[in-house]
C-alpha cells in the first residue's frame, strides 16, 4: 500500500527485511519434502522481495538501506552475490546485515557508521 515509502521518505537509514525469490524458488525445486515446498511458497507472500526493497529505498530517496532478516540468509559470498544481484541498477548504497551488525548514527550529523559487535 506504499506505507513504507510514505513514512521512510528522505530518511538517513531504512532498515528493511528482504527475500530472494530466485533462491527460494531454486530451493523449492530441490525440496525433498512437500511440507518444506509449501513453506517456501507461503513465505513469498509475506516477505518483501529484494528488488522491491531496493525500489522502496530508491523511490523514498533514503540515504542508506540496511537489509536484515534476509531470506534465505546467505551462507557464503556466492550466495550473497546472487541474493543482492536484483539491487543492481536500482539502489547501490546498502549493507547486508547479519548477527552482530551495529549501526551508530551520531547526533548532530548525518554520518552512518555500520560495523560489527566484537
Place the predicted regions along the sequence by residue.
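Cap/insert and terminal regions of metallo-dependent hydrolase folds
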Residues: 2-98
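Core dinuclear metal-dependent hydrolase active-site scaffold
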Residues: 1-9, 102-118
